[in-house]
Amino acid sequence: MLTVVTSTLHLYREALHATSRSLVRGWLAIPAVIVFTLLMLLAHQIARPLGMLGGFLLGAVNACLIGAILSLIEQAIKGMRAITLGDVIESMGHYFWDVRSVGCVLWIPTLRLDTSLRANPDSQFLVTACLLLVFILLNPAPEVIYLTRHDSPLDVLKRSYDFVLDNWIEWFLPMALVLAPLGLSLFFKLSSQLGRGAGLDFIQLVFVPFTVLSAWLTDFGISAELTGMIALLLTPPLMVGMLIFRGHLFVALSATSRRQRLYQSQFHDSAR
């Protein structure tokens, strides 16, 4: 049991060290997140009176921005040089069809869930359970898109599912440690929102670190006004750091099995 704990801690320590190095290279992704968020909010204002056409517009803008941020995170993780303004501009359009196609696959079942909820408000528990299941099984979909070779949106979903089955403890433990003190209600709120798009909704990606950080600051007794200011200021770097950490953790978990990590941990401890 001690060996399991040691190997897991070593895994997270290495991922955190790699994250810090990637943040130095990819710090420009932080102001990019701010600009992308403003663009997404502008798109919402433009799309609001356009009905169904506005929905298609929002989907396209979301796919463009999600693909761009995933491209920047990929460069921060894999690259050997600092990200430049040119990289930010060139990132627009990357992974557009990957994000759009996965979103289309999930759109119909999500629409049916919403229709069911409107027709029968008592089905709230069933809808929440379904979205929780999607949130869990498709949680690594963003990392699958930019860190693996895949043939189709269904392949992305299958690879996400397989990854979670193999690595669910190590993958979800950091999230559990962060959210556990804040209560189950916040967890179910976040899972219901993220489950709708498999983590590929840009506004939700911004919303998660903002909400979690706000909850932590509130628990520490900080006033609502100061909490809002601090959360707004720290959300972009927290979002980028979270995505980079997830990417490094995904790479580490995909490259080795749990048994291999246990063996490597024993070798690492004996070498110290």
Region roles according to the model:
Residues 1-272:
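Hydrophobic alpha-helical membrane segments
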